Amino acid sequence: MSNIIKQLEQEQLRTDIPAFAQGDTVRVQVRVIEGGKERLQAFEGIVIAKRNRGLHSAFTVRKISNGEGVERVFQTHSPLIASVELKRRGDVRRAKLYYLRNLSGKAARIKEKLN
């Protein structure tokens, strides 16, 4: 029984999502349906958390909008996500960057990773 479930989940995994990590700046294009129209809405920010659970994987993106911190959790393999674009690689030493919630301004910046 579990083999059937694994096979069905494997078919639904997306392969068009780029490899990104915590600290990276990404732009997520989300399909939004308003009334009868569908449009794309961009959400750009820093990935502060990533949860790898196969089909149930998720990541949290944080941005500052009008001086207010906004966080949004996206399901990695959701059909509502049109695309994920990697803007900038960040150099961090933590798996979860929840400490950024308490920082503001220049203190909340993340060093860029130079390969």
Swiss-Prot record:
- According to its UniProt record, which protein family does this protein belong to? Belongs to the bacterial ribosomal protein bL19 family.
GO biological process terms, semicolon-separated: translation
Q: Which GO terms describe its molecular function?
A: structural constituent of ribosome
Q: Which domain of life is it from?
A: Bacteria
What gene does the UniProt entry assign to this protein?
A: rplS
Q: Which PROSITE patterns match?
A: RIBOSOMAL_L19
**Name of the protein this chain belongs to:** Large ribosomal subunit protein bL19
One family name in Pfam for this protein: Ribosomal_L19
* InterPro entries referenced in this protein's UniProt entry, alphabetically: Ribosomal_bL19, Ribosomal_bL19_CS, Ribosomal_bL19_sf, Translation_prot_SH3-like_sf
User: What does the function comment of this entry state?
Assistant: This protein is located at the 30S-50S ribosomal subunit interface and may play a role in the structure and function of the aminoacyl-tRNA binding site.
A GO CC term assigned to this protein in UniProt? cytosolic large ribosomal subunit
- What SUPFAM superfamilies does the annotation carry? Translation proteins SH3-like domain
Q: Which UniProt keywords apply?
A: Ribonucleoprotein, Ribosomal protein
User: Which parts form a coiled-coil structure per UniProt?
Assistant: none
